């Protein structure tokens, strides 16, 4: 790597995706109040895609202010069912409510990535995927959440598609990496264009 790359996140799945892609990077979580910014954007009428992009930008800019020489990657993901925007569940009861509300319906995940260098946005993208959840009974959801435990609280949809959560779905349209929260292929293309990784 010719330039230091920092992921402005503590997300284990994003770190895994980047490591598996052969990227060398540091992970420094951004110190921002995501929920307050998210709520303000929603009050201002921002779309779920715009919310993801603005949160990713805020994270990257916050870390770039402390490490201006580095190329900082900020990421965020939003989930929406129609006009309802979801947030990470606070507890297992809320996780169950999330899953039951998705039952038999198609929801949308929006994953944003923003690169910032020296306090300036140099690249940004948002990609989306649509996921169809099979019809779920309350009893199944309860058993499922008992099996997966607290991991359900780490995802906006209360599921981890890369694990047992895959059993919740009947169909998926969109990029796998987008679903995991990182538009990896466009990111790798941009890093090659910028001569940050070997192209």
Swiss-Prot record:
Pfam families: Maf. Signal peptide: none annotated. Gene3D superfamilies: 3.90.950.10. The active site is at residue 76. Its cofactor is a divalent metal cation. InterPro entries: ITPase-like_fam (IPR029001), Maf-like (IPR003697). One of its GO terms (biological process) is nucleotide metabolic process. Keywords: Cytoplasm, Hydrolase, Nucleotide metabolism. It is found in: Cytoplasm. GO terms for cellular component: cytoplasm. Its main location: cytoplasm. Its EC number is 3.6.1.9. Belongs to the Maf family. Nucleoside triphosphate pyrophosphatase. May have a dual role in cell division arrest and in preventing the incorporation of modified nucleotides into cellular nucleic acids. This is Nucleoside triphosphate pyrophosphatase.
């Amino acid at each position: 790597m010719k330039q230091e790359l920092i992921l402005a996140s503590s997300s284990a799945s994003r770190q895994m995706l980047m490591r598996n892609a052969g990227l060398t990077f540091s992970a420094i979580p951004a110190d921002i109040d995501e929920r307050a910014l998210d709520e303000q954007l929603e009050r201002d009428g921002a779309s779920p895609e715009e919310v993801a992009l603005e949160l990713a930008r805020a994270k990257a800019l916050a870390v770039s202010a402390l490490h201006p020489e580095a190329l900082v990657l900020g990421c965020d993901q939003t989930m929406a069912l129609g006009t309802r925007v979801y947030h990470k569940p606070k507890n297992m009861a809320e996780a169950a409510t999330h899953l039951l509300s998705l039952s038999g319906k198609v929801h949308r995940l929006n994953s944003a990535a923003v690169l910032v260098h020296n306090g300036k946005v140099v690249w940004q993208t948002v990609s989306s995927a649509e996921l169809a959840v099979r019809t779920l009974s309350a009893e199944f959801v309860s058993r499922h959440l008992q099996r997966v435990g607290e991991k359900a609280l780490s995802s906006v949809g209360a599921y981890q598609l890369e694990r047992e959560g895959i059993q919740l779905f009947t169909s998926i349209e969109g990029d796998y990496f987008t679903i995991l929260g990182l538009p990896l292929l466009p990111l790798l293309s941009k890093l090659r264009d910028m001569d940050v990784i070997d192209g």
